[in-house]
């Protein structure tokens, strides 16, 4: 028996689920995916297989096999999900957002589990880590792709690699979180379902010159947070290709500092030296607290890439407005052109809150972290269906025109 809240949504959920039917191969898989999706949308305290099976009237063992072992196309579901999100939330000013989140675990048998750092957990803990791609636009925001991070040491352990409980395919090779992020960005842009001109991320991703270069090659602008120690030049770095050494020496091809070259500086030191008149107050939207005011400053710089001059772009700095100016100053790098407005640059740089809120909503409302499967395939299957449930409820939220945030049940009907 379905809850009254979900009963009103069931026709729309059936239509939504039908979009993904071709990725489940057999009728049994389509039926199981429908029931699991309903279970994720229901207000169940703990959305594991047993509890979902009990609430939706499905055999637990069959649902477990569907999640852990059935070879359905979860990547195909992600492509269709991105098309749905593009239809519902797409806008020319869309932004792709990168971040990772941890999934605490008590056991040692899950794929990729181990003591590792998790920014969302705020500590080193026994957990799995997933790298995620979000999409944000003026119409809303949600999660649109996922990758399970498998540490190099974990993959190099023969016992873990051969574990039947983790069941990691032999074809899976080590990839850094940055590489996983790049895979998702590339795939999303190549699919073309999500209109997005920008990419943003925190310093864990923004510090990577290689990832920034990938975004540029993909034809997008980035505005990413970077560490305060990141070095740039505020003027011509005065590097050039040195002349041939003698008449018979080989022509030189690599740029080197000229005698009048100035050293690169840490962005933190550059920002601290800015005059007060360089700071301009702007209001930006940031999470459940609504619009907030910050002070921003920016200047054109040359990025330092692998110890040499890289592309020219913007250094953006943000500090709290008013009496909190002694608080942490955040710095960003962007490859946007000189003509881009400060207001747009500031808005994009401050959009990382969207993926943080989506992690909180997905874990609290659609059971993103409630899974109890250990297999590599099981992780991808559960997370994929949770992303589908989240996007569906986000679309319902938009249709109803009702605010949905932590503490407000996703399935609650609009007020009369």
Report the location of each language-model feature.
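Basic, low-complexity segments
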Residues: 1-25
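Short, conserved catalytic/metal-binding motifs centered on acidic residues
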Residues: 52-53, 93-106, 133, 199-207, ...
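Acidic, metal-coordinating catalytic cores used for nucleic-acid/nucleotide bond scission
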Residues: 200-208, 228-230, 377
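Active-site-proximal, Lys/Arg-enriched surface segment
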Residues: 69-152, 158-159, 164, 299-302
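An anionic, glycine-rich sequence signature occurring as long contiguous blocks
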Residues: 14, 122, 138-170, 174, ...
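Electropositive nucleic-acid engagement tracts
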Residues: 25-29, 35, 39-108, 187, ...
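Short, solvent-exposed helix-loop connector elements
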Residues: 334, 340-349, 364-380, 400-403
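Short, basic/hydrophobic alpha-helical segments
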Residues: 80-87, 169-197
